[in-house]
Amino acid sequence: MVRYITTLERLGKDVTWLILQQARGIPEAKVIDDFMVDRTIVQMFAKADLSERLCITAAVRQMSGHCVYFAPEDKWEGAIERFPMQLLGAGSYYMDGMFVHGVPVRSWVPENEVTFPVINCGSPDAHPAHVIADIICMLNLSHDDLRNVQVAWVGSPSGALHSLVTATRYFPFRLSIAIPPI
């Protein structure tokens, strides 16, 4: 299984569909699972985002796991840029996975650098986890038939918008976009 979820493009249609199907099987938010007992996830946020942080923490706790949070003020981003192999290697001893937020995917791709899962949970150029959750909602509301689903994006461009555009290549929903002049 893919260990790095950075963009839908890198995952491709088949793997994106597989992850989506697996995510649909995740229990409701109030159900406690033991999938992550004695496992620790590190959240590395280059930009503060309380809603994303709480969402990830709740999901990991639901699966009986633990979270460690590195905030923007911890200055971790510069250290990883200068010493990626040393820090990520040492980190892999202490952690079982990593969520990265606020770092453009094109500037740091973890593939072949780490042995644990790395998930992009929101960057300026992609937000695959958010879009997979959106598509699950669309599937549930459309009774698994996305052909008649019309999605409207109204607002500023973001990683979620970029991932939605990519998702239209893999899934048969329509997307209308309205963004302010740049």
Summary of predicted features, one role per range:
Residues 34-139:
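Phosphate/diphosphate ligand-binding glycine-rich loop within oxidoreductases
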Residues 8, 22-23, 44-47, 101-103, ...:
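Fold-independent oxyanion-binding glycine-rich loops
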Residues 11-16, 25-28, 111-126, 144-149:
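Short secondary-structure transition/capping segments
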Residues 46-58, 64, 139-182:
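Glycine-rich phosphate/diphosphate-binding loop of Rossmann-like nucleotide-binding domains
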Residues 24, 88-89, 166:
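Surface-exposed alpha-helical segments enriched in charged/polar residues
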